[in-house]
Curated annotation (Swiss-Prot):
Cellular location(s): Cytoplasm
Primary subcellular site in the record, as a coarse category: cytoplasm
Top-level taxon in the UniProt lineage: Bacteria
GO CC, alphabetical: cytosol
Gene Ontology MF terms in the entry: ribosomal small subunit binding
Family: Belongs to the RbfA family.
Assembly description: Monomer. Binds 30S ribosomal subunits, but not 50S ribosomal subunits or 70S ribosomes.
Protein name: Ribosome-binding factor A
Residues of the signal peptide: none
Entry-linked PANTHER family: RIBOSOME-BINDING FACTOR A, CHLOROPLASTIC-RELATED
Keywords noted in UniProt: Cytoplasm, Ribosome biogenesis
Function, as annotated: One of several proteins that assist in the late maturation steps of the functional core of the 30S ribosomal subunit. Associates with free 30S ribosomal subunits (but not with 30S subunits that are part of 70S ribosomes or polysomes). Required for efficient processing of 16S rRNA. May interact with the 5'-terminal helix region of 16S rRNA.
Length: 119
């Protein structure tokens, strides 16, 4: 359902990535979110849905991460409204925020590799 099939969906995904990053930096002022970083965006073929994958720099526990994702999901209608005002598309996609743990897992693998090299 969320495959980048055409050049247009890739362009829209990149544009959503840029715009939502700016919106999260300047318009969403909730301390519980912390510092969100968008690691990727997947848009459906019909451009009605978008999965936004986020990571958090200063969140460590699963409860904190779940709370931050839930807050972003609750704010998704407001973010969608701001996105629709800044993008030139007929219908703004419905936004679904999901936690992306790949960066943290990659950092753990790198630290394991560096410790084995020291031995």
């Amino acid at each position: 359902m969320y495959f980048q099939h055409s050049y247009r969906t890739q362009r829209i995904a990149n544009e959503i990535h840029k715009k939502v990053s700016i919106i999260l930096q300047h318009k969403i002022d909730d301390i519980r979110i912390g510092i969100p970083t968008i690691s990727g965006v997947q848009v459906s073929k019909d451009l009605k849905n978008a999965n936004i994958f986020v990571t958090f720099i200063n969140k460590e526990g699963p409860e904190e991460i779940d709370t931050a994702v839930m807050i972003l999901q609750r704010a998704s209608r407001f973010i969608r409204f701001l996105l629709a005002n800044t993008m030139c598309i007929r219908v703004a996609p419905i936004l679904f925020f999901k936690y992306d743990s790949s960066l943290i897992e990659g950092a753990k693998v790198c630290s394991l590799i560096s410790t084995t090299e020291k031995l």
